[in-house]
Amino acid sequence: MFDRLQDVERRFGELEGLMADPSIVNDREAYQKHSREHAELADIVDAYRRYKAVSDEIEKSRDLLEDRDPEIRELAKEEISRLKDERERLDGELQNLLTPKDPNDNKNVLVEIRAGTGGEEASLFAHDLFRMYWRYAETMGWKTEIMSSSVTGSGGFKEVIFMVYGKGAYSHLKFESGIHRVQRVPETEAQGRIHTSAVTVAVLAEAEEVELHIDPSEIKTDVFRSSGPGGQSVNTTDSAVRLTHLPTGVVVICQDEKSQLKNKNKAMKVLRARLLDRMIQDQNEKIAQNRKDQVGSGDRSGRIRTYNFPQGRVTDHRAGITLYKLESVLQGDLSELVNGLATYFQAERLKQADAS
Protein backbone atom coordinates (compact mmCIF):
# COMPACT_ATOMS: atom_id res chain seq x y z
CA MET A 1 0.00 0.00 0.00
CA PHE A 2 2.79 2.41 0.90
CA ASP A 3 4.55 2.06 -2.46
CA ARG A 4 1.29 3.09 -4.07
CA LEU A 5 0.92 6.03 -1.66
CA GLN A 6 4.41 7.25 -2.54
CA ASP A 7 3.48 7.09 -6.24
CA VAL A 8 0.28 9.06 -5.55
CA GLU A 9 2.17 11.75 -3.63
CA ARG A 10 4.76 12.01 -6.41
CA ARG A 11 2.03 12.33 -9.05
CA PHE A 12 0.27 14.98 -6.93
CA GLY A 13 3.45 17.07 -6.98
CA GLU A 14 3.76 16.64 -10.75
CA LEU A 15 0.19 17.85 -11.22
CA GLU A 16 0.81 20.95 -9.11
CA GLY A 17 3.73 21.77 -11.38
CA LEU A 18 1.69 21.17 -14.54
CA MET A 19 -1.20 23.34 -13.31
CA ALA A 20 1.24 26.21 -12.75
CA ASP A 21 2.60 25.88 -16.31
CA PRO A 22 1.30 28.80 -18.45
CA SER A 23 0.93 26.54 -21.50
CA ILE A 24 -1.39 24.24 -19.51
CA VAL A 25 -3.29 27.13 -17.93
CA ASN A 26 -4.07 28.45 -21.43
CA ASP A 27 -5.23 25.02 -22.63
CA ARG A 28 -8.74 24.73 -21.14
CA GLU A 29 -9.18 21.01 -21.85
CA ALA A 30 -5.74 20.03 -20.51
CA TYR A 31 -6.11 22.21 -17.41
CA GLN A 32 -9.54 20.74 -16.59
CA LYS A 33 -8.15 17.22 -16.98
CA HIS A 34 -5.20 17.88 -14.64
CA SER A 35 -7.40 19.80 -12.20
CA ARG A 36 -9.82 16.86 -11.90
CA GLU A 37 -6.98 14.40 -11.27
CA HIS A 38 -5.42 16.78 -8.72
CA ALA A 39 -8.73 17.03 -6.83
CA GLU A 40 -9.13 13.22 -6.85
CA LEU A 41 -5.69 12.74 -5.27
CA ALA A 42 -5.87 15.60 -2.74
CA ASP A 43 -7.65 13.67 0.05
CA ILE A 44 -5.31 10.68 -0.31
CA VAL A 45 -2.20 12.86 -0.14
CA ASP A 46 -3.55 14.80 2.84
CA ALA A 47 -4.28 11.58 4.79
CA TYR A 48 -0.89 10.08 3.82
CA ARG A 49 0.99 13.16 5.01
CA ARG A 50 -0.93 13.09 8.30
CA TYR A 51 -0.06 9.38 8.62
CA LYS A 52 3.65 10.12 8.10
CA ALA A 53 3.54 13.00 10.58
CA VAL A 54 1.96 10.77 13.25
CA SER A 55 4.56 8.04 12.58
CA ASP A 56 7.34 10.60 13.04
CA GLU A 57 5.80 11.74 16.34
CA ILE A 58 5.69 8.12 17.55
CA GLU A 59 9.41 7.71 16.85
CA LYS A 60 10.23 10.95 18.68
CA SER A 61 8.12 9.90 21.67
CA ARG A 62 9.93 6.55 21.82
CA ASP A 63 13.18 8.36 22.54
CA LEU A 64 11.55 9.70 25.70
CA LEU A 65 10.97 6.16 26.96
CA GLU A 66 14.67 6.13 27.87
CA ASP A 67 14.43 9.32 29.90
CA ARG A 68 15.64 9.17 33.51
CA ASP A 69 12.49 10.90 34.78
CA PRO A 70 9.75 8.25 35.37
CA GLU A 71 7.04 10.88 34.97
CA ILE A 72 8.29 11.75 31.47
CA ARG A 73 8.49 8.04 30.59
CA GLU A 74 4.86 7.59 31.67
CA LEU A 75 3.73 10.60 29.65
CA ALA A 76 5.61 9.22 26.64
CA LYS A 77 3.78 5.87 26.97
CA GLU A 78 0.41 7.62 27.04
CA GLU A 79 1.33 9.77 24.04
CA ILE A 80 2.53 6.77 22.04
CA SER A 81 -0.72 4.91 22.80
CA ARG A 82 -2.77 7.88 21.61
CA LEU A 83 -0.66 8.30 18.47
CA LYS A 84 -0.91 4.59 17.61
CA ASP A 85 -4.71 4.81 17.80
CA GLU A 86 -4.58 7.82 15.48
CA ARG A 87 -2.26 6.01 13.06
CA GLU A 88 -4.56 2.99 13.01
CA ARG A 89 -7.51 5.26 12.20
CA LEU A 90 -5.53 6.91 9.39
CA ASP A 91 -4.53 3.48 8.07
CA GLY A 92 -8.21 2.58 7.70
CA GLU A 93 -8.95 5.95 6.10
CA LEU A 94 -6.14 5.39 3.57
CA GLN A 95 -7.42 1.92 2.69
CA ASN A 96 -10.86 3.39 1.99
CA LEU A 97 -9.38 6.23 -0.05
CA LEU A 98 -7.37 3.78 -2.15
CA THR A 99 -10.43 1.67 -2.90
CA PRO A 100 -11.36 2.23 -6.58
CA LYS A 101 -13.63 5.27 -6.78
CA ASP A 102 -16.40 6.12 -9.17
CA PRO A 103 -14.91 8.78 -11.49
CA ASN A 104 -18.32 10.43 -11.73
CA ASP A 105 -18.79 11.02 -7.99
CA ASN A 106 -18.19 14.78 -8.02
CA LYS A 107 -20.32 15.44 -11.10
CA ASN A 108 -23.69 17.11 -11.50
CA VAL A 109 -26.53 14.68 -12.14
CA LEU A 110 -29.56 14.25 -14.34
CA VAL A 111 -32.49 12.66 -12.48
CA GLU A 112 -35.33 11.03 -14.45
CA ILE A 113 -38.52 10.06 -12.62
CA ARG A 114 -41.28 8.12 -14.43
CA ALA A 115 -44.62 6.83 -13.22
CA GLY A 116 -44.86 3.05 -13.59
CA THR A 117 -47.61 0.64 -12.63
CA GLY A 118 -50.47 2.12 -10.66
CA GLY A 119 -51.98 4.71 -12.98
CA GLU A 120 -52.79 8.10 -11.47
CA GLU A 121 -51.54 7.04 -8.03
CA ALA A 122 -48.11 6.28 -9.55
CA SER A 123 -47.98 9.72 -11.18
CA LEU A 124 -48.82 11.39 -7.84
CA PHE A 125 -46.04 9.45 -6.13
CA ALA A 126 -43.67 10.47 -8.93
CA HIS A 127 -44.44 14.06 -7.91
CA ASP A 128 -43.77 13.16 -4.25
CA LEU A 129 -40.34 11.76 -5.16
CA PHE A 130 -39.55 14.81 -7.28
CA ARG A 131 -40.34 17.07 -4.31
CA MET A 132 -38.28 14.82 -2.01
CA TYR A 133 -35.15 15.08 -4.16
CA TRP A 134 -35.70 18.78 -4.80
CA ARG A 135 -35.83 19.52 -1.06
CA TYR A 136 -32.83 17.28 -0.36
CA ALA A 137 -30.88 19.24 -2.96
CA GLU A 138 -31.86 22.48 -1.20
CA THR A 139 -30.56 21.19 2.15
CA MET A 140 -27.26 20.28 0.45
CA GLY A 141 -26.94 23.74 -1.09
CA TRP A 142 -27.26 22.40 -4.64
CA LYS A 143 -29.05 24.09 -7.53
CA THR A 144 -31.81 22.37 -9.49
CA GLU A 145 -33.29 22.91 -12.94
CA ILE A 146 -36.25 21.15 -14.59
CA MET A 147 -35.27 19.97 -18.07
CA SER A 148 -38.55 18.37 -19.14
CA SER A 149 -41.85 17.35 -17.57
CA SER A 150 -45.16 15.74 -18.45
CA VAL A 151 -47.90 16.69 -15.97
CA THR A 152 -51.14 14.77 -15.45
CA GLY A 153 -54.54 16.34 -14.86
CA SER A 154 -54.36 15.62 -11.11
CA GLY A 155 -51.01 17.37 -10.73
CA GLY A 156 -48.83 14.28 -10.83
CA PHE A 157 -45.98 13.53 -13.23
CA LYS A 158 -45.99 10.96 -15.99
CA GLU A 159 -42.34 11.94 -16.31
CA VAL A 160 -40.06 14.66 -14.95
CA ILE A 161 -36.39 15.17 -15.78
CA PHE A 162 -34.24 17.62 -13.85
CA MET A 163 -30.61 18.55 -13.28
CA VAL A 164 -28.94 18.81 -9.88
CA TYR A 165 -25.83 21.00 -9.84
CA GLY A 166 -23.37 20.65 -6.96
CA LYS A 167 -20.15 18.97 -5.87
CA GLY A 168 -20.80 15.38 -4.87
CA ALA A 169 -24.35 15.34 -6.26
CA TYR A 170 -23.77 12.09 -8.15
CA SER A 171 -22.05 10.36 -5.21
CA HIS A 172 -25.04 11.16 -2.98
CA LEU A 173 -27.84 10.35 -5.44
CA LYS A 174 -26.48 7.54 -7.62
CA PHE A 175 -27.92 4.78 -5.41
CA GLU A 176 -31.45 6.13 -6.00
CA SER A 177 -31.62 4.46 -9.43
CA GLY A 178 -34.21 1.70 -9.53
CA ILE A 179 -37.87 0.95 -8.84
CA HIS A 180 -39.46 2.77 -5.88
CA ARG A 181 -42.64 1.10 -4.64
CA VAL A 182 -45.36 2.92 -2.68
CA GLN A 183 -48.08 1.32 -0.56
CA ARG A 184 -50.88 3.66 0.52
CA VAL A 185 -54.63 4.29 0.42
CA PRO A 186 -55.49 6.62 -2.50
CA GLU A 187 -57.72 9.60 -1.70
CA THR A 188 -60.30 8.23 -4.16
CA GLU A 189 -60.39 4.80 -2.46
CA ALA A 190 -63.73 4.59 -0.62
CA GLN A 191 -63.09 1.13 0.88
CA GLY A 192 -59.80 2.15 2.49
CA ARG A 193 -57.84 -0.51 0.62
CA ILE A 194 -54.09 -0.16 0.27
CA HIS A 195 -52.88 0.16 -3.32
CA THR A 196 -49.37 -0.61 -4.53
CA SER A 197 -47.82 1.57 -7.23
CA ALA A 198 -44.34 1.90 -8.66
CA VAL A 199 -42.13 4.70 -9.94
CA THR A 200 -38.80 4.32 -11.71
CA VAL A 201 -35.87 6.62 -10.97
CA ALA A 202 -32.73 6.92 -13.08
CA VAL A 203 -29.73 8.96 -11.92
CA LEU A 204 -27.23 9.81 -14.66
CA ALA A 205 -23.92 11.64 -14.36
CA GLU A 206 -23.70 14.81 -16.42
CA ALA A 207 -21.49 14.24 -19.46
CA GLU A 208 -19.03 16.98 -20.34
CA GLU A 209 -18.24 17.69 -23.97
CA VAL A 210 -14.59 16.69 -23.50
CA GLU A 211 -15.71 13.23 -22.26
CA LEU A 212 -18.21 12.36 -24.94
CA HIS A 213 -18.11 13.52 -28.53
CA ILE A 214 -21.39 13.36 -30.42
CA ASP A 215 -21.22 13.75 -34.18
CA PRO A 216 -23.87 16.35 -35.15
CA SER A 217 -24.58 14.39 -38.34
CA GLU A 218 -25.80 11.49 -36.17
CA ILE A 219 -28.53 13.58 -34.55
CA LYS A 220 -31.94 14.03 -36.15
CA THR A 221 -33.72 17.19 -34.96
CA ASP A 222 -37.50 17.63 -35.15
CA VAL A 223 -39.42 20.70 -33.97
CA PHE A 224 -43.12 20.91 -33.15
CA ARG A 225 -45.60 22.83 -31.02
CA SER A 226 -45.43 22.05 -27.32
CA SER A 227 -48.49 20.66 -25.56
CA GLY A 228 -49.72 20.59 -21.97
CA PRO A 229 -51.95 18.19 -20.00
CA GLY A 230 -54.65 16.63 -22.14
CA GLY A 231 -52.81 17.53 -25.32
CA GLN A 232 -53.84 21.18 -25.47
CA SER A 233 -51.38 23.52 -27.17
CA VAL A 234 -49.43 25.80 -24.84
CA ASN A 235 -47.42 27.55 -27.54
CA THR A 236 -48.28 28.86 -31.00
CA THR A 237 -44.72 28.44 -32.33
CA ASP A 238 -42.66 25.34 -33.06
CA SER A 239 -40.60 25.63 -29.87
CA ALA A 240 -40.62 21.98 -28.75
CA VAL A 241 -37.59 19.94 -29.80
CA ARG A 242 -37.11 16.20 -30.31
CA LEU A 243 -33.56 14.88 -30.75
CA THR A 244 -32.93 11.35 -32.02
CA HIS A 245 -29.45 9.84 -31.78
CA LEU A 246 -29.50 7.70 -34.92
CA PRO A 247 -26.80 5.10 -33.99
CA THR A 248 -28.48 4.18 -30.69
CA GLY A 249 -32.10 5.23 -31.20
CA VAL A 250 -32.07 7.30 -27.99
CA VAL A 251 -34.80 9.97 -28.17
CA VAL A 252 -35.07 13.12 -26.04
CA ILE A 253 -37.96 15.61 -26.07
CA CYS A 254 -37.86 19.03 -24.39
CA GLN A 255 -40.78 21.45 -24.58
CA ASP A 256 -40.89 23.31 -21.24
CA GLU A 257 -39.21 26.49 -22.53
CA LYS A 258 -40.83 28.98 -24.92
CA SER A 259 -37.55 29.27 -26.81
CA GLN A 260 -36.66 26.56 -29.33
CA LEU A 261 -32.94 27.20 -28.71
CA LYS A 262 -33.30 26.74 -24.94
CA ASN A 263 -35.25 23.52 -25.46
CA LYS A 264 -32.58 22.24 -27.85
CA ASN A 265 -29.77 23.05 -25.40
CA LYS A 266 -31.60 21.25 -22.61
CA ALA A 267 -32.31 18.27 -24.87
CA MET A 268 -28.61 18.04 -25.81
CA LYS A 269 -27.63 17.99 -22.13
CA VAL A 270 -30.10 15.16 -21.46
CA LEU A 271 -28.99 13.25 -24.57
CA ARG A 272 -25.32 13.53 -23.62
CA ALA A 273 -26.01 12.24 -20.09
CA ARG A 274 -28.05 9.30 -21.39
CA LEU A 275 -25.37 8.30 -23.89
CA LEU A 276 -22.66 8.48 -21.21
CA ASP A 277 -24.82 6.36 -18.90
CA ARG A 278 -25.36 3.85 -21.69
CA MET A 279 -21.60 3.67 -22.25
CA ILE A 280 -20.96 3.15 -18.51
CA GLN A 281 -23.61 0.41 -18.31
CA ASP A 282 -22.03 -1.39 -21.29
CA GLN A 283 -18.63 -1.24 -19.60
CA ASN A 284 -20.05 -2.51 -16.30
CA GLU A 285 -21.78 -5.41 -18.03
CA LYS A 286 -18.51 -6.44 -19.69
CA ILE A 287 -16.66 -6.29 -16.36
CA ALA A 288 -19.39 -8.29 -14.63
CA GLN A 289 -19.38 -10.90 -17.37
CA ASN A 290 -15.62 -11.29 -17.13
CA ARG A 291 -15.89 -11.78 -13.36
CA LYS A 292 -19.01 -13.94 -13.73
CA ASP A 293 -20.56 -11.63 -11.18
CA GLN A 294 -23.51 -9.34 -11.81
CA VAL A 295 -22.85 -7.15 -8.73
CA GLY A 296 -22.35 -3.59 -9.88
CA SER A 297 -23.70 -4.18 -13.38
CA GLY A 298 -26.06 -1.22 -13.03
CA ASP A 299 -29.21 -3.30 -13.57
CA ARG A 300 -32.18 -1.12 -12.63
CA SER A 301 -34.86 -3.75 -13.10
CA GLY A 302 -35.17 -4.64 -9.40
CA ARG A 303 -37.26 -3.02 -6.68
CA ILE A 304 -34.89 -1.09 -4.45
CA ARG A 305 -37.16 0.64 -1.92
CA THR A 306 -40.66 0.51 -0.44
CA TYR A 307 -42.54 3.47 1.06
CA ASN A 308 -45.32 2.10 3.28
CA PHE A 309 -47.68 4.90 4.34
CA PRO A 310 -49.91 2.96 6.81
CA GLN A 311 -46.80 1.97 8.80
CA GLY A 312 -44.91 5.24 8.22
CA ARG A 313 -42.04 3.05 7.03
CA VAL A 314 -39.30 3.30 4.41
CA THR A 315 -37.30 0.16 3.62
CA ASP A 316 -34.30 -0.05 1.31
CA HIS A 317 -34.11 -3.68 0.22
CA ARG A 318 -30.45 -3.64 -0.89
CA ALA A 319 -28.82 -2.54 2.36
CA GLY A 320 -31.61 -3.76 4.65
CA ILE A 321 -32.22 -0.26 6.00
CA THR A 322 -35.65 0.38 7.60
CA LEU A 323 -36.69 3.80 8.92
CA TYR A 324 -39.98 4.72 10.59
CA LYS A 325 -39.88 8.36 9.52
CA LEU A 326 -41.65 8.32 6.17
CA GLU A 327 -42.96 11.89 6.27
CA SER A 328 -39.53 13.24 7.19
CA VAL A 329 -37.91 11.31 4.33
CA LEU A 330 -40.46 12.62 1.81
CA GLN A 331 -39.69 16.15 3.02
CA GLY A 332 -36.09 15.66 1.89
CA ASP A 333 -34.49 14.16 5.01
CA LEU A 334 -32.43 11.61 3.08
CA SER A 335 -29.13 11.82 4.95
CA GLU A 336 -29.63 8.61 6.95
CA LEU A 337 -30.54 6.64 3.82
CA VAL A 338 -27.79 8.19 1.69
CA ASN A 339 -25.09 7.61 4.32
CA GLY A 340 -26.28 4.07 5.02
CA LEU A 341 -26.22 3.17 1.33
CA ALA A 342 -22.78 4.74 0.87
CA THR A 343 -21.43 2.62 3.75
CA TYR A 344 -23.07 -0.53 2.37
CA PHE A 345 -21.73 -0.11 -1.16
CA GLN A 346 -18.30 0.94 0.13
CA ALA A 347 -18.12 -2.40 1.97
CA GLU A 348 -19.17 -4.18 -1.22
CA ARG A 349 -16.39 -2.43 -3.18
CA LEU A 350 -13.83 -3.40 -0.53
CA LYS A 351 -14.95 -7.04 -0.82
CA GLN A 352 -14.54 -6.90 -4.60
CA ALA A 353 -11.13 -5.22 -4.29
CA ASP A 354 -9.94 -7.93 -1.86
CA ALA A 355 -11.24 -10.67 -4.16
CA SER A 356 -9.56 -9.27 -7.30
Curated annotation (Swiss-Prot):
Q: Where is this region: Disordered?
A: 286-307
Post-translation: what modifications? Methylated by PrmC. Methylation increases the termination efficiency of RF1.
Q: Which GO terms describe its cellular component?
A: cytoplasm
One GO MF term on file is:
translation release factor activity, codon specific
Q: Is Lyase among the key words of this record?
A: no
Give the InterPro entries listed for this entry.
Answer: PCRF, Pep_chain_release_fac_I, Pep_chain_release_fac_I_sf, Prokaryotic/Mito_RF, RF-1
SMART domains tied to this protein: PCRF
> Which subcellular locations apply to this protein?
Cytoplasm
Positions of modified residues (N5-methylglutamine): Q232
**Does the entry feature the keyword Oxidoreductase, yes or no?**
no
Looking at the Swiss-Prot or TrEMBL record, what is one Pfam family this protein matches? PCRF
Which keywords does the record carry?
Answer: Cytoplasm, Methylation, Protein biosynthesis
| Coiled-coil spans in chain | none
> Its biological function?
Peptide chain release factor 1 directs the termination of translation in response to the peptide chain termination codons UAG and UAA.
Which NCBIfam families does the entry mention?
A: prfA, PRK00591.1
UniProt family annotation:
Belongs to the prokaryotic/mitochondrial release factor family.
Q: What is this protein called?
A: Peptide chain release factor 1
**What's the source species for this entry?**
Desulfosudis oleivorans (strain DSM 6200 / JCM 39069 / Hxd3) (Desulfococcus oleovorans)
Question: From which lineage does this chain's organism come?
Answer: Bacteria, Pseudomonadati, Thermodesulfobacteriota, Desulfobacteria, Desulfobacterales
Q: Which gene encodes it?
A: prfA
